[in-house]
UniProtKB/Swiss-Prot annotation:
Gene from which this protein is expressed: celf1
Key words of the record: Activator, Cytoplasm, mRNA processing, mRNA splicing, Nucleus, Repeat, RNA-binding
Residue ranges of the region described as Disordered: 283-312
GO biological processes: mRNA processing; RNA splicing
Protein name per its UniProtKB record: CUGBP Elav-like family member 1
Keyword Signal assigned: no
The keyword Repeat belongs to this UniProt entry's keyword annotation: yes
Length: 490
């Protein structure tokens, strides 16, 4: 059978043009026709060939059109992912050609909302038949068989569906409905998957914020010992008033610095040291930094009780008030202030006492180590101000931080951009750059990026919290970026 003797000159109107892959390159139209005609009469076979070769060689795929739609579907059911042709390693791939998608059901199917619950399928068909031939109309019903007040209508062409949308959307309010009728294209499977992914991302980000709010209060115990020591040195050596000595020596510049760093802020920083030390059961913290009627006393009393368990951490509820005050202190201690303090200390080094100089250095170093913990304790409060500071230059930048402060992040969602990456990693410290890499050919994300902090402690905190964090169906891979001396950055 050659398919042309028993049929008219053209295939049926509803016939399907199929794409067929995993075909031997040595096969011609003759061998392919013998394979497919056992499922029905074949109208046309077109082998795709590489015209750059002489003679042109088969690319191992073809287009085939049967006279009937039934024959095409039977061939697909029997061959797709089922039969391996001679000399091939994978089964035949057979699916409708891209040109057939122009009239796919999803492009002709309408969702109709705010429908009267008194309507049935015939009423819906009568309402929309004026716009063209209807292939299917269906009312959505609950388990009890009652209408849910919405329906699907499928036309035979997309143009008919578009006319129905234009004429019917919000054109009337049906009986028993609070809003006008809604007529739009029904969600495709891709649309549903994207909505599900978005919902999952939102839920996971909320869970991350909740975990940061409470879990990371106990995580203060991971604060590096050197930062605790620096904070304790600042508070216990009588240096709460030492910055006042900078005023007559530094003039207006020193005045600006000390106005952003008052005794209460230093006291709050000391309170954080006490809280972290208490979480680590460091006996000296409570005795060295006790101050009555202050956030400090709350924090020390919450974690340094003699009868507390050796593995206990700071009570989150008891410490929340103190950490709120701490957030106010860190808001005044931005990166620019600390940089100015460091410059002031260096410029007036010969005039300042050793005690004051060491205090400034200690405070500057300690701040960089505790910044992420203030963010973890109060993420919503902290992120609003931090995003305005960091977002101006960090998102999209490829500026690198110091050694050990640069991260490589893999398995990012396809839709994530620079700003999303920045916001995800801000709670752990001061981000100097956040960059998602884009494929120049497709302009789509490569699903990996880099984040750089201004200190290694923040990078380690981000790795501990975010490595393995699940987004959608994948888990983030977060690790230190290799140094420039290595052949690969990751």
């Amino acid at each position: 059978m050659n398919g042309t003797m028993d049929h008219p000159d053209h295939p049926d109107p509803d016939s399907i043009k199929m794409f067929v892959g995993q075909v031997p390159r040595s096969w011609s139209e003759k061998e392919l026709r013998e394979l497919f005609e056992q499922y029905g009469a074949v109208y046309e076979i077109n082998v795709l060939r590489d015209r750059s070769q002489n003679p042109p060689q088969s690319k191992g795929c073809c287009f085939i059109t049967f006279y009937t739609r039934k024959a095409a579907l039977e061939a697909q059911n029997a061959l797709h992912n089922m039969k391996v042709l001679p000399g091939m390693h994978h089964p035949i791939q057979m699916k409708p050609a891209d040109s057939e998608k122009n009239n796919a059901v999803e492009d002709r199917k309408l969702f109709v909302g705010m429908v009267s619950k008194k309507c049935n399928e015939n009423d819906i068909r009568a309402m929309f038949s004026q716009f063209g031939q209807i292939e299917e109309s269906r009312i959505l019903r609950g388990p009890d068989g009652m209408s849910r007040g919405c329906a699907f209508v499928t036309f035979t062409t997309r143009s008919m569906a578009q006319m129905a949308i234009k004429a019917m959307h919000q054109a009337q309010t049906m009986e028993g409905c609070s809003s006008p009728i809604v007529v739009k294209f029904a969600d495709t499977q891709k649309d549903k998957e994207q909505k599900r992914m978005t919902q999952q991302l939102q839920q996971q980000m909320q869970q991350l914020n909740a975990a940061s709010m409470w879990g990371n209060l106990a995580g203060l115990s991971s604060l590096a010992p050197q930062y605790l020591a620096l904070l304790q040195q600042t508070a216990s050596s009588g240096n709460l008033n030492s910055l006042s000595g900078l005023h007559p020596m530094g003039g207006e510049y020193a005045t600006g610095m000390t106005s952003g760093l008052n005794a209460m802020q230093l006291q709050n920083l000391a309170a954080l040291a006490a809280a972290a030390s208490a979480a680590q059961n460091t006996p000296s913290a409570g005795s060295a930094l006790t101050t009555s009627s202050s956030p400090l006393s709350i924090l020390t009393s919450s974690g340094s009780s003699p009868s507390s368990n050796n593995n206990s951490a700071v009570n989150p509820m008891a410490s929340l008030g103190a950490l709120q005050t701490l957030a106010g202190a860190t808001a005044g201690l931005n990166v620019g202030s600390l940089a100015g303090m460091a410059a002031l200390n260096g410029g007036l080094g010969s005039s300042l006492s050793n005690g004051t100089g060491s205090t400034m250095e200690a405070l500057s170093q300690a701040y960089s180590g505790i910044q992420q913990y203030a963010a973890a304790a109060l993420p919503s409060l902290y992120n609003q101000s931090l995003l305005s500071q960091q977002g101006l230059g960090a998102a999209g930048s490829q500026k690198e931080g110091p050694e050990g402060a640069n991260l490589f992040i893999y398995h990012l969602p396809q839709e994530f951009g620079d700003q999303d990456l920045l916001q995800m990693f801000m709670p752990f410290g001061n981000v100097v750059s956040a960059k998602v890499f884009i494929d120049k050919q497709t302009n789509l994300s490569k699903c990996f990026g880099f984040v750089s902090y201004d200190n290694p402690v923040s990078a380690q905190a981000a790795i501990q919290s975010m490595n393995g964090f699940q987004i959608g169906m994948k888990r983030l891979k977060v690790q230190l970026k290799r140094s420039k001396n290595d052949s690969k950055p990751y």
